[in-house]
Amino acid sequence: TAFAQLDPATMAACYAPDARFDDEAFSLKGREQIGGMWRMLCTATQKPGAAEHWKLEFSGIEADATAGKAHWEAHYLFSATGRQVHNIIDGTFTFTPDGLIATHRDRFSFWRWARQALGAPGLLLGWSPSLKRKVRSTAAGNLKKFLAQG
């Protein structure tokens, strides 16, 4: 799959121009923002020292003409801390009449992710809305900078 191969251009092409993406770190509107997120994440994952930690497993893929769902487990180094993460994700999708992704919602345990990605701060504060807001704010800022770089 494009995701397993870290191919953000193909991933972005799967989304409708006005698609929406939401997870614990991002809330995005439009193919440009969503594609930018995938480019940013794939670029970080492909860096020397990080690429050998990347692994994606997926299962439970179900879809019809209007909606779908998938379960995946992503193994990677979190670029901000260099810590190993094993994120367990359940995604739901809706599709446009021409088969593009209209909405994409990923759900995962933020506290579990924070413990792995951030270490002690995530363990102590991963349950708190304030840490989640901080992570979302940082992710949005990083994406804005990444998109500005072209």
Residue spans for each PLM region:
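Short, low-complexity N-terminal intrinsically disordered segments enriched in polar/charged residues
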Residues: 1-13, 17, 140-150
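Tryptophan-centric aromatic hotspots in well-structured domains and transmembrane helices
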Residues: 3, 38, 70-72
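A beta-strand edge to alpha-helix "cap/lid" segment located at domain peripheries
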Residues: 44-150
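A solvent-exposed, acidic/Ser-Thr-rich amphipathic alpha-helical stretch
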Residues: 8-68
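General structural signal for secondary-structure boundaries
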Residues: 3-4, 30, 120
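Short, charged low-complexity linear motifs
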Residues: 1-2, 24, 58, 89
